[in-house]
Amino acid sequence: MHITMVKKRLADGSECRKCQEASEHLHSRGLWDRIDEVVWAQEGDAASPGMQLSSHLGVDRAPFFVVRERSGAQTVYVSVLQLVKERLGEAVTVQEQVQAIDPDDIGGI
């Protein structure tokens, strides 16, 4: 299994907030070393590797994760908690799930 994390770098050079939070979550659980590759989607640069991968896979948010199996099958995860639970074999608490809800992702709030 090969895990690629796609992170967004903003036009000012900083890493997006959600990408920082996802990285911190993986580090805090001791799972960062399970990420095999980090690819950057540069804001405003459609030719950047992360933007190309995002376009190819039809993903419109960052971070996201691409898990490739030896068989060539791949699965895309847009949630670090879903990745942790389904692919990294770690439990995810209800509290973590609630804390991961971002009002920016919910319309009308």
Question: Where are the regions that the model predicts?
Answer:
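Thioredoxin-like thiol-disulfide oxidoreductase module
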Residues: V39-R61, R87-Q95
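Charged, low-complexity, helix/coiled-coil-prone segments
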Residues: M1, D33-W40, V98-G107
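Local sequence-structure signature of Cys/Sec-based thiol-disulfide redox active-site neighborhoods
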Residues: M1-E37
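Non-catalytic, surface beta->alpha helical segment in thiol-disulfide oxidoreductase systems
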Residues: V67-G108
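Broad hydrophobic/π-residue packing in well-ordered secondary structure
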Residues: V6, L57, V76-V80
